């Protein structure tokens, strides 16, 4: 089946669009990437998304208008790749996350992904699966991260323990134990590790007065000096790093509010030192999760997402994990930039074939769930 996957991460850089040929379901799952592109949002739409994600209040009318605008952008992105690479049988659309509130104090969590699935189905004329998080949330799960079940079948190993580390706006991991004993599937874990590119990108925007949206090649951060005392304070005073999994987070915690809370301390540093320290914090937050909550350090970390292009961040990860091999998912057959969109395509394919897409041991849900609402074309 040819399936098109759509997703935009918390950084809202653009819409990742992947077309994949998918066969099989779990142990026999086969995915061949046929096309991939990231299509940028119109600047005004991206600004609106980031405002909402930062807590800017909207009326119901404004929120629904934004939902429709994002759906239009997603549908147009899908049509662009279909025109270039041929028809597809199914679309999976994760949408644009603007708020995520996981389970707290026994109350069900909730998560808002904009990008109206029914509108995508009608505009493209293709059955569309969207709203992938709600079924897991309704079962008391975190609803995130949504991809570990896909990682399990595409990136596991018979000979080594692996972590798949996505570094998007937020970081998330999938722990994949060696597949050489009967219970390995039940030991797969996954959760959000904390900040990915979010704090760095926002700091670059602020320090450049809006001229830059990110630190290309981490050249700016690499010239700075790390304030280890400040970095250690962030790790020690943030209770998210003491919270055991299953857990999930978002820009609500690691966005503008974080930078504003620590503005006095950051402003005492040069711009380069701020970026170097935020880079160290991002790397340390990932390693903190490994050391505190994994059964053992992985033999290999497979990195994907935009953070793979941040060489300074990868150097800091390697410095803090000297015995661990760090590679890219590209090296093991899964395109590192398309991986999240591929995973959404697989989740949609599973939903269409009534295959559960969550892992209760990962999210904390009370049972397996069919992920996504199906909107048939008319």
UniProtKB/Swiss-Prot annotation:
Q: GO terms for molecular function, please?
A: ATP binding; kinase activity; phosphotransferase activity, alcohol group as acceptor
Could you tell me the Gene Ontology terms of the biological process aspect for this record? 1,6-anhydro-N-acetyl-beta-muramic acid catabolic process; amino sugar metabolic process; peptidoglycan turnover
Q: Which UniProt keywords apply?
A: ATP-binding, Carbohydrate metabolism, Kinase, Nucleotide-binding, Transferase
TM segment ranges:
none
Kinase in keyword set: yes
Q: Which reaction is catalysed here? A: 1,6-anhydro-N-acetyl-beta-muramate + ATP + H2O = N-acetyl-D-muramate 6-phosphate + ADP + H(+)
Q: Which residues bind ATP?
A: 9-16
Listed EC numbers:
2.7.1.170
The metabolic or biological pathway listed in the UniProt record of this protein is: Amino-sugar metabolism; 1,6-anhydro-N-acetylmuramate degradation; Cell wall biogenesis; peptidoglycan recycling
Q: Its biological function? A: Catalyzes the specific phosphorylation of 1,6-anhydro-N-acetylmuramic acid (anhMurNAc) with the simultaneous cleavage of the 1,6-anhydro ring, generating MurNAc-6-P. Is required for the utilization of anhMurNAc either imported from the medium or derived from its own cell wall murein, and thus plays a role in cell wall recycling.
Of which family is this protein a member? Answer: Belongs to the anhydro-N-acetylmuramic acid kinase family.
List the HAMAP family.
Answer: AnhMurNAc_kinase (MF_01270)
Q: What is this protein called?
A: Anhydro-N-acetylmuramic acid kinase
């Amino acid at each position: 089946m040819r399936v098109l996957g759509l997703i935009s991460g918390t950084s809202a850089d653009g819409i990742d669009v992947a077309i994949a040929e998918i066969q099989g379901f779990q142990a026999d799952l086969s995915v061949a990437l046929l096309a991939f592109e990231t299509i940028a949002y119109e600047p005004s739409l991206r600004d609106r998304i980031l405002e909402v994600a930062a807590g800017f209040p909207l009326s119901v009318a404004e929120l629904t208008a934004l939902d429709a605008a994002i759906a239009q952008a997603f549908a147009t992105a899908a049509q662009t790749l279909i025109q270039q690479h041929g028809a597809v049988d199914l679309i999976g659309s994760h949408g644009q996350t603007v708020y995520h509130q996981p389970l707290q104090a026994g109350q069900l969590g909730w998560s808002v992904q904009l990008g109206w699935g029914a509108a995508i189905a009608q505009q493209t004329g293709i059955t569309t699966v969207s709203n992938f998080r709600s079924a897991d949330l309704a079962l008391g799960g975190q609803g995130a991260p949504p991809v570990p079940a896909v990682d399990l079948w595409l990136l596991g190993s018979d000979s080594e323990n692996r972590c798949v580390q996505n570094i998007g706006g937020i970081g998330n991991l999938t722990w994949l134990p060696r597949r050489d004993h009967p219970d390995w599937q039940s030991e797969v874990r996954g959760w959000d590790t904390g900040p990915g590119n979010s704090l760095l990108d926002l700091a670059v925007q602020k320090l450049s007065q809006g001229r830059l949206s990110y630190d290309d090649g981490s050249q700016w951060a690499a010239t700075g000096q790390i304030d280890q005392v400040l970095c250690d304070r962030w790790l020690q005073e943030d209770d998210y790093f003491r919270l055991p999994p299953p857990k999930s987070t978002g820009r609500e915690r690691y966005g503008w509010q974080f930078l504003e809370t620590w503005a006095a301390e950051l402003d005492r540093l040069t711009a380069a030192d701020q970026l170097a320290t935020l880079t160290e914090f991002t790397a340390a937050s990932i390693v903190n999760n490994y050391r505190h909550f994994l059964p053992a350090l992985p033999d290999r970390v497979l990195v994907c997402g935009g953070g793979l292009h941040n060489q300074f961040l990868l150097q800091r990860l390697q410095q803090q994990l000297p015995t661990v091999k760090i590679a890219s998912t590209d090296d093991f057959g899964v395109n590192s930039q398309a991986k999240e969109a591929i995973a959404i395509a697989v989740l949609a394919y599973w939903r269409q074939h009534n295959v559960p897409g969550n892992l209760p041991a990962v999210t904390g849900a009370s049972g397996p769930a069919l992920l996504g609402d199906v909107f048939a074309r008319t």
